[in-house]
């Protein structure tokens, strides 16, 4: 895997309060939507093996990490222009009592291996649901399944589900939300007993997890006018040399239809999924903050990834957000195995953080005893307080 998933950690955290503003009691009012999202992007065609079985999936991980495999820049076959609409499954939740933060919309983007349920766990939601935590502080929040995951559309895994497409999906979804036409332009799939109406948010804050955080970094750099702030979790600019970073060979993958034929029946060639709970523990968790029930839940909600995402990673990087002036906060597990080779202490790269966010005064926070999935670890609710406290301290 490339540096985009390992870079992280911007400036020491400046006096974030332990309690984020005033907590309110609120009923969860949500509407599930199928959003047609227009996308124009330039993807790449790559020379690479096909993945049509678990044998292929394992062989692909070996091939892509073999020292003599040509770099991605030498495997380019040309451009592929994407000009289409994709059906994205999303959930908009608003507080039942309209307070001063109700018109601040958070948009949460999950990472590889997850859909929007990463932010809205069904197990002990008061502890593990970031959606619930945000609503209790009076925010509105939009979560969505990235392309190729959950209930969203599952197109070609080689040529369409790539990083450029996913960046533009987030940008377009943000534009639709800011226009006040999110609900009216979508198909309503289910809703709470009380009707939720379209509204024009006064501010938009991007909340990312891992790969989702990287997408957000690119979106705020390309489209600075769309967002007013960002919290990037499980992403951390650091000083680990590229040669020491963990690559995809550390984790076993299977062809989705062979891993779970019923659950993954829609997934075709080019998709693969993490094999089992052991792989999920290695990637996402640390023993001290691991609740076995959450590990089982993670296995239940895990999502496939695509060959195209990994291939396009080799052509992707952080962009300098010259025109973005909103606050940025990096939030990382103290012992994130994936980003920091198991220990994120004392490796924060402030120079890199300030290079990519020169006008955002970026800060960082290490969530104690936590791995790569802080929202699904035992101390999740304490971490949510830190994140929401950061927003409150910046008038968001």
Task: Put a short name on every predicted segment.
Residues 367-380:
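Catalytic histidine-centered segment of alpha/beta-hydrolase-like enzymes
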Residues 159-198:
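Alpha/beta-hydrolase active-site loop
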Residues 22-101:
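N-terminal cap/lid segment of alpha/beta-hydrolase-fold proteins
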């Amino acid at each position: 895997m490339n540096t985009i998933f390992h870079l992280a950690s911007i400036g020491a955290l400046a006096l974030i309060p332990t309690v984020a503003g005033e907590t309110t009691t609120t009923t969860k009012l949500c509407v599930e939507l199928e959003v047609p999202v227009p996308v124009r992007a330039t993807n790449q065609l790559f020379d690479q093996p096909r993945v049509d079985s678990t044998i292929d999936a394992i062989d692909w991980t070996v091939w892509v990490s073999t020292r003599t495999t040509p770099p991605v820049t030498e495997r380019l076959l040309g451009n592929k222009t994407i000009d289409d609409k994709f059906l994205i499954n999303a959930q908009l939740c608003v507080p039942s009592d309209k307070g001063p933060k109700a018109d601040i919309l958070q948009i949460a983007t999950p990472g590889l291996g997850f859909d929007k349920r990463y932010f809205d766990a069904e197990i002990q939601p008061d502890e593990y649901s970031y959606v619930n935590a945000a609503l209790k502080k009076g925010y509105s929040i939009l979560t969505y399944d990235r392309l190729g995951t959950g209930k969203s559309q599952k197109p070609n895994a080689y040529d369409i589900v790539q990083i450029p497409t996913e960046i533009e999906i987030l940008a377009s979804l943000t534009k639709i939300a800011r226009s006040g036409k999110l609900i009216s332009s979508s198909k309503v799939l289910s809703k709470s007993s009380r009707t939720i109406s379209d509204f024009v948010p006064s501010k938009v804050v991007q909340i990312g997890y891992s790969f989702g955080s990287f997408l957000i970094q690119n979106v705020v750099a390309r489209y600075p006018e769309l967002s007013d702030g960002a919290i990037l979790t499980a992403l951390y600019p650091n000083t680990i040399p590229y040669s020491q970073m963990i690559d995809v060979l550390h984790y076993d993958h299977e062809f989705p239809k062979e891993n779970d034929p019923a659950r993954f029946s829609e997934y075709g060639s080019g998709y693969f999924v993490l094999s089992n709970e052991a792989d999920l523990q290695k990637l996402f968790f640390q023993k001290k903050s691991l609740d076995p029930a959450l590990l089982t839940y993670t296995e239940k909600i895990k999502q496939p990834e695509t060959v195209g995402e990994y291939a396009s990673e080799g052509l992707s990087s952080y962009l300098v957000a010259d025109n973005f002036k909103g606050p940025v906060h990096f939030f990382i597990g103290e012992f994130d195995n994936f980003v920091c080779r198991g220990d994120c202490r004392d490796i924060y790269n402030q120079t890199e953080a300030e290079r990519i966010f020169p006008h955002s005064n970026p800060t960082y926070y290490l969530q104690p005893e936590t791995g790569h999935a802080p929202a699904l670890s035992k101390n999740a609710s304490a971490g949510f307080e830190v994140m929401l406290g950061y927003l409150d301290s910046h008038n968001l």
